[in-house]
Amino acid sequence: EMQRSLVGSEMCIRDRDNGDIYVFSPSYAKTMADKRQQTTLDAGVVRIKAGTEEFDPDYYYSIEAQTGGKSFIRCWHITGDYFLLLMYDRPLTETGFTANQLAIYKGETGKLTYVTGLPSADLISGFGNTPYVENGYAYMAVTTTEGYPSIYKIDPVGAVATKGVSIEATQISGVGKLQPQN
């Protein structure tokens, strides 16, 4: 039943370090008006071990069980089995939900930890489209309703964000690094 519930809403991310594939399902089908499209299953993560083609029957972690029913809208691989998730502020079964929090998911343990060191969630008005990842850290643009947007360096092991440079702009859609051409 888990495989069926993932169709149409999953995000597959390969752990580039060991080849495992993690499939993140935000369970967004809970918001569908048509009962035939709805699901009651939690947002969660399943895994396909490297070298296999089947879901690992012993691997399923509920994101909602760790967050009081909250789900996520996006996820990105950072390093090893660490993933960055853009989280909603309330369950999808409620109205007015917004994605204004970040969390780290550790694949091996299935543990989700909210990132500390960011501005208060009620001040966050947006994030960059995609984090820049380098040397085991994620760099994410964070826009708030107070002040200029800033780039935050996120340490996935400690789930801690450190504020970096602020940019005199209204929003930052992304951050990256230019490499010289040889």
Walk through the language-model features, giving the residues of each.
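Surface-exposed loop and turn segments in beta-propeller and other repeat-based domains
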Residues: 7-9, 51-72, 112-125, 167-181
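Beta-propeller blade signature
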Residues: 37-53, 98-109, 151-156
